[in-house]
Each structure stands twice: as C-alpha cells, then as structure tokens.
C-alpha cells in the first residue's frame, strides 16, 4: 500500500487532455506537486460530484491535477468535454496505476470487476507521497480543505 513518505510508484497509461497521448507519471514530476485523484467510473454520480468539486474548488496554479480511472480514454474524453474539466484525465484500463497504488475496488454488483478505489495522493516535486486519502466507501468524497492544505504544504516546500 502506497503511503505518505513512500516514493510515488511510476506507471504508464493514456492521458486525455485535449488529445489522447501517452502518460508516464515520472515525466510529470518536477517543480510543483502532482495530485492524483483516483475515481471509480466516469459519468457516475459521486465521481462526477468529485470531479466537478475539483474543477470548481481546486483552481490553483501551483500544482498539476490528474483524475485517474479505469475507463477507456475515449470515454474519458467525452466525460471531460461534457463536464468541462480543465485538468487531464488518465485512463488506466490495464490497471497499472490502481495496482501500483493498491487502490483496487470491485463493483461486481454493477457488473464491473475492477475499478479504482476513490483515493487522492499528493506527490511532491521529488516524487515522494506527501498526502494520502482513501475512501471508506465509494460514495465518500475527499476532504477538499485537507487536500488544499496538503497541496499548500507541498507547494511551499517546492518554492523554498
């Protein structure tokens, strides 16, 4: 289980950020913190509430935010457009990211075996996890104030 103080596991997937392109986490690490917001499924109620909250309440220029789900990139492209999400979405249908971060949830009752557990990680410019939040159930959203504080701390350290 990836936790605070660990080196952030690298992974490859597809990034939807206007176009669909290859994504490698290590290539995105640098001067500012990276936030990975894992969510179970595009177009579902709680996931959309979370992504819209991040869109509306987490508009800051001192970090890079990515939503991460096991959805296919073309589905994420439609989702990103429909909900006007300004941040990139990472499609992880091969489960590399959710396995690396150990945020795997089964939704067998919905006919889907493996999805991302709702979770948020803040990674500093050195690639170290500085914040981790895991949902206790799929309907739970993160504490956005705590996330904001965690990014403030990581951004302040990066600026020092």
Predicted regions and their residues:
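Chalcogenol-based redox active-site neighborhoods
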Residues: 1-160
